[in-house]
């Protein structure tokens, strides 16, 4: 389940997750939990502590396994979203998740992410805050019950 107030973005893999007929070699696709709510003006910020927070709280239940998740602040929205098409730029997220999955250690991943976030390509397109959280299942399928190693 996802919950959000205001702008920022929650993105997750659009694969069927439990669909055994899905092509494992198909390019990844991503879904947006909610379109960002910028309020009346671009710089409007909504807070959970506001009296009218319930009017702006959005909740989404996704009844399937999610293997890739990204949460970001509004500073990266223009790079990550196709505003005209009201959808996610898959090509923004796919390389990020490939890097996370292939990362051999925390130091390498940190250097790679910092290099991307502070790159000329990113900085030319935003002057706002840039916060990005990436989470992925390294092992996509974990059995519901594991064999007892003592047996």
Residue positions per predicted region:
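Secondary-structure transition/turn motif
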Residues: 5-6, 36-37, 74, 150
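Conserved catalytic micro-motifs used in adenylation/nucleotidyl-transfer and phosphoryl/amide-
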Residues: 1-15
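C-terminal catalytic subdomain
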Residues: 46-151
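Glycine- and acidic-residue-rich phosphate-binding/metal-coordinating active-site segment common to enzymes
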Residues: 11-54
